[in-house]
Regions:
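Conserved residues at the C-terminal ends of beta-strands
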Residues: 83, 109, 181
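Pre-Walker A adenine-sensing motif
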Residues: 4-17
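Phosphate-binding/switch region of NTP-binding enzymes
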Residues: 141-215
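Short, glycine/charged-enriched secondary-structure capping and boundary segments
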Residues: 39-40, 64-67, 96, 120-123, ...
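Acidic active-site catalytic centers that drive phospho-/nucleotidyl reactions
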Residues: 10, 53, 109
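P-loop NTPase motor core
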Residues: 88, 94-173
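A conditional alpha-helix N-cap/helix-loop micro-motif detector
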Residues: 2-6, 31-34, 88, 129-132
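Conserved P-loop
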Residues: 18-97
Length: 215
């Protein structure tokens, strides 16, 4: 298990980020999705990590701040293999790298962006969902067969029915656990889905050192 760095969230996840599981972190912009993904990387930093960045949001200086907060050396940043992915073909091709390397952690930030960009027309909606589901199926198989913990981040989109995770129906088939990040007033909240029974969530704040739980 890899810790998220948030004790309460780890408990809701059953111990943390598990091997052979695809964990989906989703929420609106500025909510801390990338920060949480980086924090998970820092907690797995002794392993080889593949970090695929589809939006140009990866900032090595943020990882360094988190390492320094844990009194860890900057040389550990070398354990993170960063891929700047610019189109769907590159994103799909990067599956081969995962298969060959079998890293201790894979992070894909953000998993749906390029599919939404390249298939932006309404007439391409079906093709977009099919292509994305094929990709997620391959990623999920790699994750399960090689017992690799995989973390993906995703955005939300608004329509007349409210806000929903981007490509929600297509991604939900292939993700085993979801972490929904949201904000109520001045409070950031993290909830693990599926949630059976009473709603369970933790509150957190965003700091230079990462996400901190508010107890």
């Amino acid at each position: 298990m890899i810790s998220t760095g948030l004790v309460g969230l780890d408990k809701l996840l059953g111990g943390g980020i598990a091997a052979g599981i695809v964990t989906d972190i989703f929420g609106p912009s500025g909510i801390g999705k990338t920060q949480l993904a980086m924090q998970i990387c820092v907690n797995a930093i002794n392993e080889k990590i593949i970090y695929q960045d589809t939006s140009g949001s990866f900032r090595p200086e943020r990882i360094l701040e988190m390492l320094q907060a844990k009194k860890l050396g900057p040389e550990l940043l070398d354990n993170i293999i960063i891929s700047r992915v610019r189109n769907i073909s590159e994103q799909i091709d990067n599956l081969k790298k995962i298969s060959e390397m079998r890293p201790g952690l894979v992070v894909i930030d953000t998993v749906t962006d390029l599919f939404s960009f390249e298939y932006s027309k309404e007439s391409n909606a079906l093709e977009k969902h099919i292509k994305f589901m094929q990709y997620m199926h391959s990623l999920c198989l790699l994750c399960i067969q090689n017992k690799i913990p995989v973390v993906v981040t995703n955005v939300v989109r608004g329509d007349e029915e409210g806000y929903h995770e981007n490509l929600e129906k297509s991604i939900s088939i292939f993700t085993h656990k979801k972490i929904r990040l949201s904000k109520e007033g001045n409070k950031f909240l993290a909830q693990v889905l599926p949630c059976f029974g009473a709603k369970k969530e933790i509150a957190y704040k965003i700091t230079p050192q990462g996400l901190d739980e508010i107890t």
